[in-house]
């Protein structure tokens, strides 16, 4: 699979962490659902699995894959 590069360094496969805890999490399922924000801890590392329109990023965490805005994420220190 070819990585999709963006201006802020986010691409499929990049590891990220939450910069700010959202009020809720939106699943990246074909029919999205809202889930409580405490499913992902602020220091948990996730992996970008998809780039969506309107600055949304699909990120896989331990307890699911969620749609998050780019402003809510920062690159993980490796």
Task: State where each predicted segment sits.
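Basic/aromatic-rich interaction segments and small domains that mediate binding to polyanionic partners
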Residues: 2-78
